[in-house]
């Protein structure tokens, strides 16, 4: 339906929740096939013997329920601000409108026959929104003799795969319908690593370099989604085109590749798959950081319009933040102080000064070069 891009894209995501068409596992021999599995609700994950107990392996539900922003996703729709958006768009109650609940309370868009009675009325974005309908794998997924492949075959979404993880999250964290933007909905910027850290994480990463890897996969998937939307919005505002082209620029710098105009969506998705298929490493992170800090000359190019430069800088500083985090520097270290200045430079995009930013970026690059060799 024209003009309903968020709904169409995200309803595809919800449909995926309602029918994960994955192969049945011969090892687990579950009684319910993944395609027929129902959603059980967060309560099904909360027992002390599962994810509601104490300790690193059993405290996930407590972290999610007490600290994760997703638990408050539905509550956001009850605010005066949300009602103002809904009034502008004549949606009625935002807490009940599918235009809003598709991302803030996805269970509302799942057919009743796919939900067990244990599903909470106002769960927001809960366990199965990301992990998939649990009826076909809940009872056995914590058993020691069950492999990750067994769980995935039984219907659990493979969130260890960063490409799959990014695709699960991006549907509600990047694109907006034009009318929602016009009504005042906050702009969305997808940052897989940064937003995962802010949740905070209720899972363990086995690779200490997975953060930069997740960041890059997330950026590539974000470009894929932005390109998808712009192909369906021929009359998109210049702002959206600038955002897409800024992200494209950053990914070209990071990857060392030239992104083709004709196949940009395919290119960005393939980049995400390629990066997700390789283990993150110190060498890869250093190379990415070096490539991005060496872009100060780009911001001295007077032929590039200021709004596009501002959008480039906006994406760049977020990326530098995620990559610099791996160095575990003190807040008073020279690179950290210089990065703080770069963030200040992009606080007001209309007032962004490319030349000033270029100078500060060069200072940041020099501060990194002066780090002691013992530091990563």
Language-model segments: which ranges?
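Extended, amphipathic alpha-helical scaffolds
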Residues: 269-376
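Short cysteine-rich clusters marking metal-coordination/redox-active sites
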Residues: 45-47, 100, 127, 169
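Post-signal peptide N-terminal segment of secreted/secretory-pathway proteins
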Residues: 93-125
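Short metal-coordination and nucleic-acid-contact micro-motifs, chiefly zinc-binding Cys/His arrays
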Residues: 38-46, 96, 123, 165
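Primarily the internal scaffold of c-type cytochrome electron-transfer domains
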Residues: 31, 54-88, 112-125, 133-317
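Bacterial N-terminal signal peptides that target proteins for export
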Residues: 2-14
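Bacterial N-terminal signal peptides
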Residues: 12-24
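Short N-terminal segments immediately surrounding and downstream of signal-peptide cleavage
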Residues: 29-48, 52
């Amino acid at each position: 339906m024209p003009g309903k891009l968020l709904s169409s894209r995200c309803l595809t995501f919800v449909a995926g929740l309602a029918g994960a068409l994955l192969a049945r596992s011969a090892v687990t021999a579950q009684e319910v096939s993944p395609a027929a599995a129902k959603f059980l609700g967060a309560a099904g994950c909360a027992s002390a013997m599962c994810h509601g107990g104490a300790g690193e392996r059993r405290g996930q539900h407590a972290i999610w329920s007490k600290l994760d922003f997703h638990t408050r996703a539905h509550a956001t729709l009850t605010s005066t601000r949300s009602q103002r958006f809904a009034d502008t768009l004549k949606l009625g109650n935002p807490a009940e409108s599918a235009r809003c609940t598709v991302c803030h309370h996805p269970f509302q868009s799942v057919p009743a026959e796919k939900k067990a009675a244990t599903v909470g009325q106002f769960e927001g974005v809960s366990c199965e929104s990301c992990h998939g309908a649990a009826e076909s794998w809940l009872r056995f997924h914590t058993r020691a003799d069950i492999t990750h492949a067994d769980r995935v075959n039984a219907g659990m979404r493979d969130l260890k795969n960063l490409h799959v993880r990014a695709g699960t999250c991006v549907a509600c964290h990047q694109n907006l319908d034009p009318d929602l933007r016009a009504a005042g909905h906050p702009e969305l910027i997808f940052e897989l690593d940064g937003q995962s850290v802010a949740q905070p994480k209720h899972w363990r990463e086995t690779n200490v370099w997975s953060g930069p890897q997740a960041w890059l996969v997330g950026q590539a998937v974000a470009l894929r989604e932005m390109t998808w939307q712009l192909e369906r919005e021929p009359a998109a505002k210049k702002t959206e085109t600038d955002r897409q082209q800024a992200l494209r620029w950053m990914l070209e710098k990071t990857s060392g590749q030239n992104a083709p105009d004709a196949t940009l969506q395919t290119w960005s998705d393939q980049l995400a798959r390629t990066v997700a298929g390789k283990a993150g490493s110190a060498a890869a992170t250093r190379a990415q950081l070096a490539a991005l800090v060496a872009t100060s000359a780009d911001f001295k190019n007077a032929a590039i319009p200021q709004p596009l430069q501002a959008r480039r800088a906006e994406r760049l500083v977020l990326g530098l933040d995620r990559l610099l985090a791996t160095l575990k520097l003190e807040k008073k270290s020279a690179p950290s102080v210089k990065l703080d200045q770069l963030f200040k430079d992009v606080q007001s995009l209309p007032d962004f000064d490319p030349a000033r930013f270029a100078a500060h970026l060069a200072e940041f690059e020099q501060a990194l070069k002066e780090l002691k060799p013992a530091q990563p």
